[in-house]
From Swiss-Prot:
Active site per UniProt: 181 (charge relay system), 249 (charge relay system), 346 (charge relay system)
Site (Cleavage): 134-135
GO biological processes: defense response to fungus; defense response to Gram-negative bacterium; defense response to Gram-positive bacterium; innate immune response; positive regulation of antifungal peptide production; positive regulation of antimicrobial peptide production; positive regulation of biosynthetic process of antibacterial peptides active against Gram-positive bacteria; proteolysis
UniProt protein name: Spaetzle-processing enzyme
CDD domains assigned: Tryp_SPc
Organism, scientific name: Drosophila melanogaster (Fruit fly)
């Protein structure tokens, strides 16, 4: 049996022993050395689980998501056989800021998450982690993958017809990052469609709530999806919808109200520090969405693909035949036969996992801009707006 499975089995055995508040012994105040917590950059202490409310409360949650199970198992740092009771013996790596008295077992969004203002970007202790125009040749995601993915919902003028035409990524409690052409384009003008709302926490557009059956036969359902009306769209001032180059193809969508984070609704991280200037050449990245499949029909289920980033010079050589001139604010990825972003995935994130504080954190390296028609042509990568080139612009546009 794998170490992770053994650890979780041990933690599972104590669930039935937890009822209401966990009683702490004097030994629970002892630290067994420093450690690196699973979901925090700060240093942690190896302590009794009863001294770590964050993990003690999580232990009492049923049913647990796969990510919660993994977090619990990987957080265990030992056993203290000097004390009585299986619960009291478990040692976990707890971030210093999360130690203290045990709180109520009912899980609720943290105060920090619930009250975060629109001009505040979350740290990588909150954003970019998993509790998995255009996806072509993709595979299904799991129910919990990419919780920052959103659908942009459009309403036709003088009609009650709604459609999902673009994707995007949640940046914080109030803003979504998407492509400029998702807010201004000839196609939108012709169709008479206007951006109306944003859907969060979606996986399968045919069902609400979304449910999945695990290998052990247990059926788990996510909360119902959330539709929030748009307060305003902010298109980059230098974006020209009719330009063949499609530079500055980036936009922000401000929601009418703040959204609280959950396992199924969570922001992705913006590039920071050295990632801002990184062009990510030869990196493998993930793209996800509900766009057209190889059958040229929108996918009901969120799909994902893995693409490799091209050298910009090589990409320019491909697109020069279309008189396209790429610059450093753009990047290219993909080009594998039958694997591409496609109609409906525009505005979605190009995601790169970076090991941070002992876990993978997803950053939004790019925003889906455009590609070839038909999608998925061998040797033709898709073009993305490079997010790192617009960090200052994004921060300037955020409001409380």
């Amino acid at each position: 049996m794998a170490s992770t499975e053994r650890n979780f089995l041990l933690l599972s055995l104590v669930v039935s022993a937890l009822s209401g508040l966990v009683h702490r012994s004097d030994a629970a105040e002892i630290s067994f050395g420093s450690c690196t917590p699973q979901q925090s950059d700060e240093r942690g202490q190896c302590v009794h689980i009863t001294s770590c409310p964050y993990l003690a409360n999580l232990l009492m949650v049923e049913p647990k998501t796969p990510a919660q199970r993994i977090l619990l198992s990987k957080s265990q740092c030992g056993l203290d056989n000097r004390v009585e009771g299986l619960v009291n013996r478990i040692l976990v790596c707890c971030p210093q800021s999360m130690r203290g008295n045990i709180m109520d077992s009912e899980p609720t969004p943290s105060t920090r998450d619930a009250l975060q203002q629109g001009d505040v970007l979350p740290g990588n202790d909150v954003c970019g982690f998993l509790f998995a125009d255009r996806i072509f040749g993709g595979t299904n995601t799991t129910l919990w993958e990419f919780p920052w993915m959103v659908l942009l919902q459009y309403k036709k003028l003088f009609s009650e017809t709604y459609t999902f035409n673009c994707g995007g990524a949640l940046l914080n409690s109030r803003y979504v990052l998407t492509a400029g052409h998702c807010l201004a384009s000839r196609e939108l003008d012709k169709s008479g469609a206007v951006l109306h709302s944003v859907r969060l926490g979606e996986w399968d557009t045919r069902t609400d709530p979304d449910c999945t059956t695990q290998m052990n036969g247990q059926r788990i359902c996510a909360p119902k999806h959330i539709d929030i009306e748009v307060e305003k769209g902010i298109i980059h001032e230098m974006y020209a919808p009719n330009s063949v180059d499609q530079r500055n193809d980036i936009a922000l969508v401000r929601l009418k109200r703040i959204v609280s984070y959950t396992d199924y609704v969570r922001p992705i991280c913006l590039p920071t520090d050295g990632l801002v200037q990184n062009n990510f050449v030869d990196y493998g990245m993930d793209v996800a969405g509900w766009g057209l499949t190889e059958n040229m029909q929108p996918s009901a289920i969120k799909l994902k693909i893995t693409v490799n980033v091209w050298n910009l010079t090589s990409c320019q050589e491909k697109y020069s035949s279309f008189k396209v001139k790429l610059d450093d604010s753009q990047m290219c990825a993909g080009g594998q036969l039958g694997v591409d972003t496609c109609g409906g995935d525009s505005g979605g994130p190009l995601m790169v996992p970076i090991s941070t504080g002992g876990r993978d954190v997803f950053y939004i390296a790019g925003v889906t801009s455009y590609g070839t028609k038909p999608c998925g042509l061998k040797g033709w990568p898709g073009v993305y707006t490079r997010t790192g080139a617009f960090i200052d612009w994004i921060k300037q546009k955020l409001e409380p």
